[in-house]
Amino acid sequence: MAVGKNKGLSKGGKKGGKKKVVDPFSRKDWYDVKAPNMFQTRQIGKTLVNRTQGQRIASDYLKGRVFEVSLADLQKDIDPERSFRKFRLIAEDVQDRNVLCNFHGMDLTTDKYRSMVKKWQTLIEAIVEAKTVDGYLLRVFCIGFTFKDQQSQRKTCYAQQSQVRKIRARMTDIITNEVSGADLKQLVNKLALDSIAKDIEKSCQRIYPLHDVYIRKVKVLKKPRFDISKLLELHGDGGGKTTEAVVSAEGAVIDRPEGYEPPVQEAV
């Protein structure tokens, strides 16, 4: 064994030494996520973001986040007909420590969608693009299945192609009329109550009996230009004031006069 100096020990070990461990959560803040007033549950959760440092503004990193929430949680309802619907809400603005969200889409859970597909029946689906009164372009997916008559001795309940085309045309007409004749808030209420699917099922009974008719998915393809007053109106404000309206922790909007400045704190 060669006898000599250990260069690593003489120089004080490895380069840099032991680094100081910094908790990443010490640089982050919690923000409350607020749903529009069309839902009973206003605060749907909290989200994390890094604090504002220099040109990195925290609100810029919050805008555009999408939150997926069950309709049963939004409406405080344990009805199983609501639990399999998921609503997507997108963060559009930040007021104080509150993230104001707007409707961004709807979908069914995977287990519900797969449980409906069975043998010996015909699946009928329609895809419709329509624009609401306030300028939202939506793509709506509707699904339905043929229903076997209890008095029938046949094992199957397949519909003819002519009947499928008539049902799909009826679906398209009803969805187009419902979407184009309502604004976004009214349409979300219809989706929550599932009134469009019920109208389709009732209207198509004369062509062929249907069951499990649902609005399977809704996508927002295009939105109008962002308007803070309309967003505050969705969250409970009348839209009279713009930037002076602030949402409190309980979800209520507080109006502040123009030129309002917070008082200067003597101690921090």
Swiss-Prot record:
SMART domains: Ribosomal_S3Ae
Alphabetical keyword list: Cytoplasm, Developmental protein, Differentiation, Oogenesis, Ribonucleoprotein, Ribosomal protein
Region described as Disordered: 1-21
Main location: cytoplasm
InterPro entries tied to this protein: Ribosomal_eS1, Ribosomal_eS1_CS, Ribosomal_eS1_euk
Pfam family, one: Ribosomal_S3Ae
Disulfide topology: none
GO BP terms, alphabetized: oogenesis; translation
One annotated Gene Ontology cellular component of this protein: cytosolic small ribosomal subunit
GO MF annotation terms: structural constituent of ribosome
UniProt-annotated location(s): Cytoplasm
Role of this protein: Essential for oogenesis; required for late follicle cell development.
UniProt record similarity statement: Belongs to the eukaryotic ribosomal protein eS1 family.
Binding partners and assembly: Component of the small ribosomal subunit. Mature ribosomes consist of a small (40S) and a large (60S) subunit. The 40S subunit contains about 33 different proteins and 1 molecule of RNA (18S). The 60S subunit contains about 49 different proteins and 3 molecules of RNA (28S, 5.8S and 5S).
Protein name from the UniProt record: Small ribosomal subunit protein eS1
Organism of derivation: Drosophila mojavensis (Fruit fly)
Classification of source organism: Eukaryota, Metazoa, Ecdysozoa, Arthropoda, Hexapoda
